[in-house]
Amino acid sequence: MGPGRRGNGIGGPGAPRLGGLRRGGRRGGRQGVAAPLGHGRPRLAGRRRGGPPASGKEPSDSGLPRGRRRGSRQQWQQSRPPGDLGVAPQAFQWARAGGRGSGAGRAGGEGVDAGRGVPELQHRGGGGEPGRWQWGGRRQRSSSRRSGGEGGEEAEGSGVGAGEGETVQHFPLARPKSLMQKLQCSFQTSWLKDFPWLRYSNDTGLMFCGWCQTTPEDVGSVDLPQVGHDELSRGTRNYKKTLLLRHHVSTEHKLHEANAQVLGSQACVTVDGSAVDKPDASEGCLLVGNESEIPSEEGYCDFNSRPNENSYCYQLLRQLDEQRKKDILCDVSIVVSGKIFKAHKNILVAGSRFFKTLYCVSNKESPNQNNTTHLDIAAVQGFSVILDFLYSGNLVLTSQNAIEVMTVASYLQMSEVVQTCRNFIKDALNISIKSEAPESVVVDYNNRKPVSRDGLTSSRDQKIASFWATRNLTNLASNIKIENDGCNVDEGQIENYQMNDSNWVQDGSPELAENESQGKTKVFIWNNMASQETGKARRKNQTTKRFVYNIPPNSETIVEDCSVLQPPVAYPEENKALLIKEEPVSDLDGALLSGPDGDRTMNTNLLAEACSSQDAGDAAGASHDFKYGLMPGTSSDFKYGLLPSTSNDFKYGLLPGAPNDFKYGLLPESWPTQEPWENGDSSLIMNKLKCPHCSYVAKYRRTLKRHLLIHSGVRSFKCEICGKMFTRREHVKRHSLVHKKDKKYKCMVCKKIFMLAASVGIKHGSRRYGVCMDCVDKSQPGGQESIDQGQDTEFPRDEEYEENEGVEPDEELAEDGQDQSDAPRWDEPGGAYVSG
């Protein structure tokens, strides 16, 4: 009995184990004598010629040498696992699961020693690569193939001879070749669906953009070192996807989007650079540039072979934009504040409902319509952004143009753009500036750009541009200096007033003590240089200012809503000039200047250059040049909110003066050096709440503020039914009763019902009382004069006017006709009480 090729004869180490016995033999020779073995897992040898078939049936004796057939059958029965019925021993062999795309290789040679009982063994020889050995159960026999020629793939240590082929188990890919390949398979199925431009390099293990050759690590940090596949493993999955999203929405990526190559129109390129035919998507390969193919368990569809849905739209809009810039086939000219914009009517009609109504509806009525359209807007920059948006689909919003773009979009009836601008401004309001605010920032109000001390725009100042452009001045907590910009002060345009700091500064203010101790002289300067603009602009005589914001670290002092917002400024005893520079600007400039975020009202230091008393005296007597609201006031000429103290913060009438000379915020010529209540002069106290335009004296500051709106001529409240404008909200409520059919008024004393309000009310100023004339005569024998004297005690008053005593006659109510009463009303007898 000769020894096996790897064994040493009987029980050699190279002999296969069968049922706890070791036997040795030669390929094609006789069986060796079995020897007991007390260790190791029972392993099945490969079939010898004529051995048990793969079907699991008992082998026949015809294939064995004479005299040995019965013994081999007994040994085969002993090798069957207990409890398993009808399963061939080949089903329990250790099958190899190596290889990449073509399955397990063939073992065309002898196996290594199997006596150690370790499952992680490898074949020597054959076409396959080293791989893992797995136990194949009966449920894993899903695929098989026939192998002929040199012999089939066998278990380790078998000495099976060559000859006819045999059925051998094969299994799908168990795991990738390396960690790099495993990560690639995981990101194929998810990220490539979201980012069709994403590519993966087998050489470096890095992801990169196939359109602009940018790795996600380069997007996050340009200084990030490239260290192979470790970059792919570093960081969380969400972090890497965030980098991909950031690059996906970047401007650089969008510029290369049009240059993305469609793989379907090109040949695939292998690693060595040779051109091959495009493979089928089901083969599970990804060919990118000079990268090798990457297998996938479930196949991969090349997303780059799909046409880009936006590429045609992008190319079309880009061509139209080039035609617009070169004035090719432009059929309309848009004139905005004297500047001409060439455009195509088709693009304008498709993007704006305003132009659609103008060119489609109006064109039918007037076929001979001119090709020039004048827009009644003054925001040239905003219209330019909107026009670029119509031709590109990209809306470029910055902190400098957000409000202008929103205004133009509202005028052109582009609701989506308006909503986008609102969201942009809302997000800008949430920016906190306190940690980044410099000590001094110069804001050029013409361009609304922060300028540094040397006149150049700094990168740090640009960070807060959105903040300055979206706050209103009522929240300003800064020291404002209005620069003269080297302009000479014209004579005849300056008004001289003597100012005293005791009436301006709050008690206990730290700024007051500092200013008084240092003896600073600060004057608020205004130079009236407004020019009359021509054209169809809705707003004329507008002003522009150049402010310097000096933001101290901790100079915020919150003031109550009803308190006086007073600038803590120390003025000298001699006369100084009140000058402010004024230049023409667009109609939107009054809405953008802003201050620090989050605070309601602050102390405001008005810092300006001092003018000599001689210059101020020469320029005196020009009060008619000043319009309402040069200092915190309200007027149609003064764009509300340019100065930090609006009507909510500055209380009119606190500065006493002659009615003819006192113009909203201008300081009177005669300024008292002592508080009026210190001398006990009650008349001066009452004059503090006296209207400068009429003889009305208010009892409360808020009443005087509301009274001054009548002189301003501003009507902010509109009737929803007829569109009539009113100065106050309560006037609109009373006016709305005119449009109601059933109006029944009830006397508050005798409960008698009247159909007309004039029959119930007593007109005294703007006050109406729900008491009929009969009850008035009974309760007040003195008549109307007694009513005027005792009106505070005899009649119940409307809660809405409890502080508004003796208000002047209301001009708006006289136009209402039949509704001349402020009497309360009952809809039905015994019904609910309705207050006017």
UniProtKB/Swiss-Prot annotation:
Region (Disordered): 1-165, 781-836
Compositional bias segments (type: Polar residues): 781-792
Cross-link Glycyl lysine isopeptide (Lys-Gly) (interchain with G-Cter in SUMO2) mapped to chain: 182, 434, 449, 463, 536, 639, 651, 663
Acidic residues bias: start-end ranges: 797-819
Protein name: Zinc finger and BTB domain-containing protein 10
Residue numbers of Omega-N-methylarginine PTMs: 100
Organism the protein comes from: Rattus norvegicus
Superkingdom of this protein's organism: Eukaryota
UniProt key word Transcription regulation: yes
Modified residues annotated as Phosphoserine in this record: 147, 531
Compositionally skewed regions (Basic residues) per UniProt: 40-50
Pfam families membership: BTB, zf-C2H2
Biological process, per Gene Ontology: negative regulation of transcription by RNA polymerase II; regulation of transcription by RNA polymerase II
InterPro entries: BTB/POZ_dom, SKP1/BTB/POZ_sf, Znf_C2H2_sf, Znf_C2H2_type, ZnFinger_BTB_dom_contain
Gene: Zbtb10
Tissue: Expressed ubiquitously.
